[in-house]
Design a protein with these regions (language model features):
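Terpene synthase/cyclase
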Residues: 2-532
Length: 532
């Protein structure tokens, strides 16, 4: 039986408070280490070189020297503007377009298909214990190839779940219990935290002898992140496992296990980005004594084939950005196209045609939001922003004549891009998405304008006043609403009236997840500023 919870109960304001509390691969040789730059062939520094005064976030305005074209904003050529001194992108257009891979074409597709069938047989064959099947499923997931075997995995989990007698599992150790708990919860099965009761002593603490079981502790640690409200035992499990894993690192003789522990303490599985995790785990799995060579070779080949697809998508996005021309017309903006593509890749990474379409379009929306945010936060004067916001709120192309030159480019480019997305949604899903897309942009720019007025007027909002705007000005609702239509199709994923109503009124699942994202972003920003 799977967990079924209403959206309202999952994302109520009452539960919000609880919610707040990281190359191509040679298939038969050693893998190259590329934890972040996995879709690029060459080693590049991920850090952007910036000037020493990179962030100018104080109230004092700084004269930002732009090109002559940009200074044709008004007759007055001495407009004083803020400047964030964003560093230029390190991902040049020519470099991105030069990316290539050998892992394309029928030869590799046939080779991958053969290996896939062999792994599929592995998934279906009977094993000595259910735990062995769960370990295989977990390995397949961590290697990043589980999307090939979704039906097989669900079938295995259904069978194991229905055959499990949780009340008579006293002989099952900490590792197996934790793995079962994590996998079942990840796939939506109803599993009670009572399965951990047998590991608790009379004083309500985890039994002391468990501190010596490093493998079990690691499994418990990963399971502890699948927590819901009022499950304090999992919070205690996390604290207990972290404490003893750190202690055990000093005495672990198995280098592979030590690597797994260190990595998990840095990035738990529940927080990890799938493609980055897969790239890292392929290396680790290849060093294990019980490695399955067929599975390993399939994971390597699949990674390389996917990487080739991702490279082509990035090249496509780069051509769109080059043709849009914003980076040349408005050089004060952040060119973060590659980072925006990575964002979309963390959401969905499989090679299906609809997934490729989603990543390409989602990258565009992300970069549009980033650029317009810079107009409000950095470059635009208050008077210009009022005109800019008015154009967005009325969404009338004729209002472009009221805007400065750089805003004309931006407004028309954004309007055309959103209209194109609306057309694609109509073509693929049979729904007129434009009213919903336009509304999200109007609401976003309205919040941007409100915060711009706060800045220029020296107004410090109360916490409630800030939060009422922050969840929207973080732009996550805009990305979510565009994503809803990008994922839609008339056959596989049709648009529903319930869904349209939810995005129109910003259902709690949108609002509160956006709030979490915004507050986490603010916290990370303050932390980065504090370390400079």
């Amino acid at each position: 039986m799977k967990i079924i919870s209403s959206l309202d109960s999952l994302f109520s304001p009452q539960k919000f408070h609880h919610t707040i509390q990281k190359s191509r691969i040679g298939c038969h040789q050693q893998l190259r280490s590329m934890p972040v730059r996995f879709f690029i062939n060459h080693q590049l520094s991920w850090k952007t070189k910036v000037s020493t005064n990179r962030h100018c976030w104080n109230k004092k305005l700084i004269n930002c020297n732009m090109s002559t074209t940009l200074n044709e904003l008004r007759d007055d050529q001495t407009t004083v503007r803020r400047c964030a001194n964003y560093g230029p992108t390190i991902w040049k257009y020519e470099y991105i377009q030069s990316l290539n891979s050998n892992y394309v074409g029928e030869h590799y597709e046939m080779k991958a298909a053969k290996l896939k069938e062999e792994v599929k047989l592995m998934m279906l064959e009977k094993m000595e214990t259910p735990f062995q099947k769960l370990e295989l499923i977990d390995t397949v997931k961590r290697l990043g190839v589980s999307y090939h075997f979704e039906k097989e995995i669900e079938g295995c989990l259904d069978a194991i779940y229905n055959e499990t007698n949780w009340s008579s599992e006293d002989a099952v150790d900490l590792n197996e219990t934790s793995l079962r708990f994590r996998l079942f919860r990840q796939h939506g099965y109803n599993v009670s935290i009572d399965v951990f009761d047998k590991f608790i002593d009379q004083n309500g603490n985890f039994k002391k002898h468990l501190s010596e079981d490093t493998v079990g502790l690691l499994s418990l640690y990963e399971a502890s992140f699948l927590v819901v409200e009022e499950e304090s035992i999992l919070d205690e499990a996390r604290d207990f496992s972290i404490k003893h894993l750190k202690q055990n690192l000093k005495i672990i003789n198995n280098s592979n296990l030590a690597m797994l522990v260190n990595h998990a303490l840095e990035v738990p599985l529940h927080w990890a980005m799938q493609r980055f995790e897969a790239r890292w785990f392929i290396d680790v799995y290849g060093k294990q004594e019980d490695v399955n060579i067929t599975l390993l070779n399939f994971a390597k080949l699949d990674f390389n084939i996917l990487q080739a697809i991702h490279q082509e998508e990035l090249k496509h996005a780069s051509r769109w950005w080059e043709n849009l021309g914003w980076d040349k017309q408005m050089p004060f903006m952040r060119d973060r196209l590659v980072e925006c593509y990575l964002w979309s890749l963390t959401e969905v990474c499989d090679p299906r045609t609809e997934s490729q379409y989603y990543r390409r379009m989602s990258t565009r929306v992300n970069q549009l939001v980033t650029s317009i945010d810079d107009i409000y936060d950095v470059y635009g004067t208050l008077d210009e922003l009022e005109l800019f916001t008015n154009a967005f709120l009325k969404w009338e192309v004729n209002l472009v004549k009221t805007l400065p030159n750089y805003m004309k480019i931006c407004f028309l480019g954004n309007l055309n891009s959103v209209n194109e997305l609306g057309y694609e949604a109509l073509k693929h899903a049979g729904v007129n998405a434009l009213p919903y897309l336009i509304k999200s942009w109007k609401d976003l720019c309205g919040c941007y304008m409100k915060e711009a007025r706060w800045f220029h007027e020296g107004h410090v909002p109360s916490l409630d006043e800030y939060l009422n705007h922050a969840w929207m000005s973080g732009a996550i609702p805009v990305l979510a609403i565009h994503g809803y239509f990008l994922c839609a199709s008339t056959s596989n994923n049709p648009i529903t009236e319930e869904g349209l109503e939810a995005i129109k009124n910003y259902h709690d699942i949108i609002k509160w997840s956006s709030m979490v994202g915004r507050l986490v972003n603010v916290g990370n920003f303050q932390e980065r500023i504090g370390t400079r």
